[in-house]
Amino acid sequence: MFSIVYTTTGNKEEARRIASRLVEQKLAACVNMHPIDSIYEWEGRIEQDTEIALSIKTTSSKVETVTGCIKEMHSYDLPAIISWEIKGEKQYLEWIAGSTRP
């Protein structure tokens, strides 16, 4: 099984630091980074921020470890970390499996 883990960061440097560690440690095959505008409620106030969204491609068995790594490195008090299982083109999924194998 394969998954995408999604999170956001406050800036590109933090996004690159998290993405690099995940790929270097073979926890993710690929991390896409996207600039986004976010509107959300935090501590009773409506906030608007520019953030970087990360789409992290990994195996489902590594989601918990990926989540722990993100939480360890993240600057937010409560980072958004969500995941969902995916289907895809067979060869691409095989590449994800191979790229995350120690």
Where do the protein language model's features map onto the residues?
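Positively charged, small/polar-rich N-terminal and surface patches that mediate targeting and assembly
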Residues: 1-102
